[in-house]
Amino acid sequence: MTDYLLLFVGTVLVNNFVLVKFLGLCPFMGVSKKLETAMGMGLATTFVMTLASICAWLIDTWILIPLNLIYLRTLAFILVIAVVVQFTEMVVRKTSPVLYRLLGIFLPLITTNCAVLGVALLNINLGHNFLQSALYGFSAAVGFSLVMVLFAAIRERLAVANVPAPFRGNAIALITAGLMSLAFMGFSGLVKL
């Protein structure tokens, strides 16, 4: 049980996918201008990343390795992610039309999020079992969502702040992301993986 807790804390805080591994920077910078959109993208990404990690592990373990098709791993995982995103879109559309309208634009964007593919590939490279793969995918998504929501809240405050002209827009956003990355480096001694 302690190993799973360490995996969760290590993935969310110490080895954050956005601030440490630099995966998922496109939605991190693009969707984080408003807190509501960042929260919606975070929820959708959490669901997709967790489910894609599980499906990718199952396909790799039950199909690719037994048939010696490991060279198709990246292509297979991209297809798995696309199918999971489409499945998620269909389920959300049928079960909650309000949530579908809220997340409508974000669901197709998750297909191109490199963090989702990165989690699936890292699960295999790190030799995780089924439970570890599911937890790693969920933890990476929680870390992604946490950082994106924090960044969106900071950007909303910066939008009304008196920022010097050369630093307005993307410049102050990149400086803020760098400072957040430095702040998360403070967690580096917390867990040794």
From Swiss-Prot:
Transmembrane spans: 5-25, 39-59, 63-83, 102-122, 134-154, 171-191
The UniProt record lists the keyword Glycosyltransferase: no
A GO-annotated cellular component: plasma membrane
InterPro entries: Ion_transpt_RnfA/RsxA (IPR011293), NqrDE/RnfAE (IPR003667), NqrDE/RnfAE_oxidrdctase (IPR050133)
Keywords: Cell inner membrane, Cell membrane, Electron transport, Membrane, Translocase, Transmembrane, Transmembrane helix, Transport
Enzyme Commission (EC) number: 7.-.-.-
Location in the cell: Cell inner membrane
Enzyme class: translocase
Protein name: Ion-translocating oxidoreductase complex subunit A
Species per Swiss-Prot/TrEMBL record: Escherichia fergusonii (strain ATCC 35469 / DSM 13698 / CCUG 18766 / IAM 14443 / JCM 21226 / LMG 7866 / NBRC 102419 / NCTC 12128 / CDC 0568-73)
Recorded name of the encoding gene: rsxA
